[in-house]
Amino acid sequence: MNEDQEQITLVDENGNEELYDVLFTFESDDFGKSYILIYPAGKSDDEEVDIQAYALPADDDPANPSGGDLQLIESDEEWDMVESVLNTFLADGTIDPNAGSKD
């Protein structure tokens, strides 16, 4: 893992906090949104990871996300686009391509 890895904390409906590493963020002109892909912090490079994707709040900068409520991706069209971007990213072998999920 990159020691300078950006991290965020997600808080669930019960107030439990969990730390995540940011895999990457990107913008989609087609959907007019920005997205963030994350995975649980503390995973070693050879461990399978559960990659999660969310839409960023409308006023958040994808180059420097500042927080707020992440939005669930709800449409199949958006998921297809996010998965395509993720697969392109994974093609360079950075993370196991069999690890992604829609959770």
UniProtKB/Swiss-Prot annotation:
Give the InterPro entries listed for this entry: UPF0473 (IPR009711)
Query: Which superkingdom does the taxonomy of this entry point to?
Result: Bacteria
Family, per entry: Belongs to the UPF0473 family.
Task: Provide the protein name.
Answer: UPF0473 protein LVIS_1220
Which species is listed as the source?
Levilactobacillus brevis (strain ATCC 367 / BCRC 12310 / CIP 105137 / JCM 1170 / LMG 11437 / NCIMB 947 / NCTC 947) (Lactobacillus brevis)
